[in-house]
Amino acid sequence: MKEKRFLRLNPSRGNFLAAGAVLLASAVFFILEWPLALEEDASGQQRLCWWYVLAFSGLGALATGICLLQFDLPGAARQAIGWLLVLLLPLSTFVVVDVINGTKIWQFSGRKWLANYLCYLLVFALAYALTRRPWAAVAIGGAASLTFGIANYFVVQFRGQPILPWDLTSFGTALTVSGGYEYVPTRKMAVGALYYICTVAFCVKVAPQDAPHASRRFHIAERLAALSISGLLAITLFPLNGLSYLDISVWAWNQKGSSELIGIAASFFANAQYMMVDTPDGYSARA
C-alpha cells in the first residue's frame, strides 16, 4: 500500500513561473542594492555583512522552494491552519515593522506587545472580512502594514517624527514633496520584504483557496464573524480607550520618542484615538 504524503514537490508550470519570479526578483534586488551586503568594521575597512547575506539568500531560497511545493491536507485542516495564520501573522508583522523602524521592541512589556498585536490584528481581520480568504487577508494585511512601516521609516528620516493620523489629510501634498528625496532601502527592509513573500507563499499553499463543500450559510457566518471581531477590536481600541489600559500613551511634543517606546502601530492608533474628542456638554458652535 502506497503511503500518502501531505507534502510533495509539484513542478507544474505555474509553480515554476512563481518560483522563477521570486528568484529573479530577489536576485535583481540583491545585485542593484549590492552595497547592502557590505559594512564597515571598526577600522573603517569594508567587509561582508554576513547576517544580511545569509538571511536574504536563505529567505529567497525558502520562498522559491515553497512555490514548488504542494501540501495535500484535508479541507478542515486547511481551514484551521488558515485561521491560525490570520491570528498569528499580525504578531510577526508587528515585529518586522518595529525592527525596521528601530524601536525598543525587545524592551516592551507584555501589555505593549498585546496593544500592538491588537492594532495589526484589526487590519488583518478587516482584510479577512472583505476577502474571506486567509491567503488574501495575509497578503493585504501584510502589504499594508509593511508599506506603512517602510513609509514611516523614511518620514522619520526626512522630518524627524513618525507618520501621524492627521498627515493623511495632506496626502496629496506629501506625495508631491516626497519626489525631492532619495529613498535608500535598508537591510532590515529587504529581509522583511522577503519574509513577507515567504508568509504569503506559504499561506497560498496551505490555506484553502475556497471551500466548495461549504454552504452559503457558512460563508456568510465566516464573514460576519470576521466583521464582528473587527468591530469589537475597533470599539475596544477607540471608544473604550483600550490602549490606555495597556500602558499606551503618547507625548505630543516628542512623537518619535513615543513611537520608539510603545511601538509604531500603537503610537499611530493612540494619536488617532485622541482625535476623537467628545464634544463638551453645553457646547454650541454658535457661541
What are these regions (language model features)?
Residues 141-287:
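N-terminal secretory/membrane-targeting segments
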